[in-house]
Amino acid sequence: MSRKRTSPNRNVQIADQIQRDLSELIMREVKDPRIGIVTIQSVELTPDYAHAKIYFTALTGDPDKTQEALNHASGHLHNLLFKRLHIHTVPTLHFHYDQTIEKAVEMSRLIKEANSTRAKDDDEADAPAKDD
């Protein structure tokens, strides 16, 4: 007896659909004042579609409070997704603040700082020594 495996392509398609639907539902259906302007960056589904990690960024408001509010509203959002998606199992939603942008900015700052330090050291090494 063979088990039916889900296609990786189907997993990606469902994750993309959840991302689009959640973006719209959060904007139109969730009225929590702790949730400002939110962008859903990505959705990661487990192979059995039981759980979904939703990565978001918040343009306004405190990211921790936004995450708390989104996780609080996850049951309501799950029910709304159930009405939209045509799949047997709608995943339990777990919201996570996506720190990729902040980490990228910090890495860029560190690289720039290292390059300026290196350039300064090179300039000092190239300068002729002064003899008195």
UniProtKB/Swiss-Prot annotation:
Gene3D superfamilies: 3.30.300.20. InterPro entries: KH_dom-like_a/b, RbfA, RbfA_dom_sf. One of its GO terms (biological process) is maturation of SSU-rRNA. One of its GO terms (molecular function) is ribosomal small subunit binding. Residues 113-132 are annotated as: Disordered. It comes from the Bacteria. It is found in: Cytoplasm. The keyword Cytoplasm applies. One of several proteins that assist in the late maturation steps of the functional core of the 30S ribosomal subunit. Associates with free 30S ribosomal subunits (but not with 30S subunits that are part of 70S ribosomes or polysomes). Required for efficient processing of 16S rRNA. May interact with the 5'-terminal helix region of 16S rRNA. HAMAP family: RbfA. This is Ribosome-binding factor A. It comes from Burkholderia ambifaria (strain MC40-6).
